[in-house]
Amino acid sequence: AMIARDKERLKSLEDELEDSKGYSCELRNQEYLNSTIDNIIKDFGYPDVFIHNAVRGTRGNFLEFTSEELQSNFDINVIALHRIAQKVAPEMIKKGKGAIIVTGNTSAHRGKANFGGTASTKAAQKILTESFARYLNPKGIHVAYITIDAAIDLEWTRKAWPDKPDDFFIQPDDIASEVWHITHQSKS
């Protein structure tokens, strides 16, 4: 099951990924998000793995971005993570197994001048994930925050850095492979 705003993107992913289903959802709308999670549970049962890969960022110094933009970043990067984890973690706890994986980026570790609107929310996301881990790891649930310190090879990043060589960009399939590995790593 996959959640995204863009229905066309979801359809493309459904076509690419066997036995997958996409659910269009605006993560900032709590009622809509809860309904979407309920539909996923109805269609597939409770997930054994929850990967939070949603992100919203704002560029510009603190004088340039609005409080509304900052709130929107928090709603997607932090609040949606919290809401979904609250819905799926209790069943993982009952089973004594599961994984919650959160992807983030370098801004979770530092606040550059023009990334305050993103960095503050990614840092909060990282700390929230660490809190999940301290509570859930003893209950058998693996929790990890993965920092992606690279430009992901996407259409918009290629447009943003048109002069960069191919090896400047990290491949989405390579990220997915590492996420899979971390999700399934042994407890030792």
Where is each model-derived feature located?
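C-terminal helical subdomain
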Residues: 138-151, 161-188
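Conserved NAD(P)H cofactor-binding loop of Rossmann-fold oxidoreductase domains
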Residues: 53-59
